[in-house]
Amino acid sequence: MINIRPDEISSIIREQIEQYDQDVKVDNIGTVLQVGDGIARVYGLDQVMSGELLEFEDKTIGIALNLENDNVGVVLMGNGRQILEGSTVKTTGQIAQIPTGEAFLGRVVNPLGAPIDGKGDIANTETRLLEAMAPGIISRKSVCEPLQTGITSIDAMIPIGRGQRELIIGDRQTGKTAIAVDTIINQKTEDVVCVYVGVGQKASTVAQVVNVLEEKEAMAYTIIVCASANDPATLQYIAPYAGAALAEYFMYNGKATLVIYDDLTKQAMAYRQMSLLLRRPPGREAYPGDVFYLHSRLLERAAKLSDALGGGSMTALPVIETQASDVSAYIPTNVISITDGQIFLSNDLFNSGIRPAINVGISVSRVGSAAQTKAMKQVAGKLKLELAQFAELEAFSQFASDLDEATQKQLARGTRLREVLKQPQNSPLSVAEQVALIYTGINGFLDELEVASVKKYCASLLSFLNTSNNSYIGIVSSTNQFTAEAETALKEAISESKAVFMK
């Protein structure tokens, strides 16, 4: 017979009792009442938070947006085809967040931070809330450093500073994305992390942007967030916030960042679709009442941080598409009032061959001039004046037949200045090169050239400055000032290159 040892049994029982864990896990579970059009109505989630992530039986994730008396309105982040009426939903206790980190550089991700470029998983170090609070007044510093776009007409007349929000607005096919991509390419030597957010774009358009950035070796410091036209409205709605969260990680680590939202019109449309399906009351143009807050809370996250917080910055370039150049529509006026200035692209200028098609007359930068480099300030003031007078005279000269010599000279110079400001796509210029071209134009060095050969001469002048042992580029690049020494060197370069060009 086996010996039973009571002391051993009692010690085992005591050990089991000591290890007994009395923690009770309570899941808040609800039932799907109806589902369709990317929206689910759920009954029974009494403890749910506004904006909380919910998990359905088929692992689809949704966001609780409408908390009503008897049900919860949930927007789905997937197609929801496997969700059935009566299936269960449980709360996750989490608010929407996205993984962030250095490993995201050079990658294409969806608004949830999952890679969609086929290059494997991304090792993330931390997560950030999609809807983070914008920095307060004490956390900020006034805009004081320039962000060079490499586009002469912008850097000279509508300068952008680090931490600024500058709207790019225009009709479809007027070169809005081209300006944004050029700006990214120009940050190659500037140590700026760029985030391009494609909202509601064709996947082929985003692929084209990726190809251009790879060709120009700009993907190394760029993250692309893509919610294409065939993605659910929920993903299109959160994509800009995801881009801002990715940029914030670098901003709070003391880096300069640039975020491009291309474009916020499509985000507003996605939000309108969600709101109408959730039966929220429509307002002007059927947009919900809080569509202003949709964009203001996003764009307020762009800032130049104080030195105490590391001095990082986030510059935002939101893009808005207008219909028939109607800037007074609801979304354009909203975003114009939120941002620190706008670059207006005109269809007529684009079609008449002036590219980038920037309408300088109605484009403004409200804070960027404080951050403009001294070299550019020295030549840009006169350029603005010349172009403003030229625009006025050009309109007048269409009616007047006999013009005096001074007026004809001014018109001729204005036409040549306009040629100087034309620039091919994906070929941004350095500050020194821009200053050289503007100086050449405003001081009459191009007056004796034919209008048709101005662009050709500008190209030859730049190649001369970059290849000869002329000291101009070195002086301006190192001092950021257009000194008397630099002016002398530039005048020499102009006369030498012109002599070769005129042969």
Curated annotation (Swiss-Prot):
Organism encoding this protein: Trieres chinensis
Keywords recorded for this protein, A-Z: ATP synthesis, ATP-binding, CF(1), Chloroplast, Hydrogen ion transport, Ion transport, Membrane, Nucleotide-binding, Plastid, Thylakoid, Translocase, Transport
Task of the protein: Produces ATP from ADP in the presence of a proton gradient across the membrane. The alpha chain is a regulatory subunit.
Subunit structure: F-type ATPases have 2 components, CF(1) - the catalytic core - and CF(0) - the membrane proton channel. CF(1) has five subunits: alpha(3), beta(3), gamma(1), delta(1), epsilon(1). CF(0) has four main subunits: a, b, b' and c.
CDD domains for this protein: ATP-synt_F1_alpha_C (cd18113), ATP-synt_F1_alpha_N (cd18116), F1-ATPase_alpha_CD (cd01132)
PROSITE patterns to which the protein is assigned, alphabetical: ATPASE_ALPHA_BETA
SUPFAM superfamilies named among the record's database cross-references: C-terminal domain of alpha and beta subunits of F1 ATP synthase (SSF47917), N-terminal domain of alpha and beta subunits of F1 ATP synthase (SSF50615), P-loop containing nucleoside triphosphate hydrolases (SSF52540)
Protein name: ATP synthase subunit alpha, chloroplastic
Membrane topology: Peripheral membrane protein
Domain of life: Eukaryota
Gene Ontology CC: one annotated term: chloroplast thylakoid membrane
Entry similarity comment: Belongs to the ATPase alpha/beta chains family.
